[in-house]
Amino acid sequence: MSALLSPDQLEADLRAIGARLYHDQHPFHALLHHGKLDRGQVQAWALNRFEYQRCIPLKDAAILARMEDPTLRRIWRQRIVDHDGNSATDGGIARWLHLTDALGLDRTLVESGRALLPGTRFAVQAYLQFVSEKSLLEAIASSLTELFAPNIIGQRVAGMLKHYDFVSSDALAYFEHRLTEAPRDSDFALDYVKQHADTVEKQALVKAALHFKCSVLWAQLDALHVAYVTPGIVWPDAFVPDRDASRVAA
């Protein structure tokens, strides 16, 4: 039987999971960050990623609803504000739509979800189901991928600005905000997990939760790579560059 880890040992194990499995290791991100994708492939990434962005506040609301401690709720609800904003023109979702607008995608099509890859939809729904059904500790632990976000954000912004003349720093404003939001959120979640994962069984659960979340992010990139890189198998109802870039959903 495994021994109980100290909080710092648990953190080291969690960081090791991220170092091995976080989606910065996926080949699709290497292509994106090094300028190896064309405009249509970048559009496909942004359109499909919106489904994940759209559901982040739904995920956080599901977690919030299970928190009985008002102090904890006050801290966690900031995540919802960060993405929903205080108006229709503010917040992470609005900033992601600003990116898809800048890439030439029709906003109605993006928001409708009609052109998503099935793999994108299934991965995001699996994440929502996970945080709704698992323990509060596991749900919070699943958010710990944010520990690794600042590094990939730095790579993404620098790489996209360097290699794609159709991308501007203004279009990438979403990522600038996440450079401060993600560390704040992950610091809190990590402290919570280290404090509350106080048995061998709970420590195994939080590590499994982070492992699962890494698989959710990886699966979304698998779907994009199969459809838009190689072998190029696109779901018939999914986004097709050129044909759909300005298509308005019926």
Swiss-Prot record:
Q: Give the catalysed reaction(s), semicolon-separated.
A: 6-(2-amino-2-carboxyethyl)-7,8-dioxo-1,2,3,4,7,8-hexahydroquinoline-2,4-dicarboxylate + 3 O2 = pyrroloquinoline quinone + 2 H2O2 + 2 H2O + H(+)
The UniProt keyword set, sorted, is: Oxidoreductase, PQQ biosynthesis
Q: One Pfam family name from the record?
A: TENA_THI-4
What pathway does the annotation place this protein in? Cofactor biosynthesis; pyrroloquinoline quinone biosynthesis
> What is the enzyme's main class?
oxidoreductase
One annotated GO molecular function is: pyrroloquinoline-quinone synthase activity
**Does this entry carry the keyword Hydrolase?**
no
Q: Say which domain of life the source belongs to.
A: Bacteria
Q: Which residues form a coiled coil?
A: none
List, alphabetically, the InterPro entries matched: Haem_Oase-like_multi-hlx (IPR016084), PqqC (IPR011845), PqqC-like (IPR039068), Thiaminase-2/PQQC (IPR004305)
Biological process (GO) annotations? pyrroloquinoline quinone biosynthetic process; sulfur compound metabolic process
Is rRNA-binding a UniProt keyword of this protein? no
Give its E.C. classification number: 1.3.3.11
Free-text function comment from the UniProt entry: Ring cyclization and eight-electron oxidation of 3a-(2-amino-2-carboxyethyl)-4,5-dioxo-4,5,6,7,8,9-hexahydroquinoline-7,9-dicarboxylic-acid to PQQ.
* PANTHER family per UniProt: 4-AMINOBENZOATE SYNTHASE (PTHR40279:SF3), PQQC-LIKE PROTEIN (PTHR40279)
Classification via HAMAP family: PQQ_syn_PqqC
Task: Name the protein family.
Answer: Belongs to the PqqC family.
Q: What name does UniProt use for this protein? A: Pyrroloquinoline-quinone synthase
Species, as recorded: Xanthomonas oryzae pv. oryzae (strain MAFF 311018)
Q: Which gene encodes it?
A: pqqC
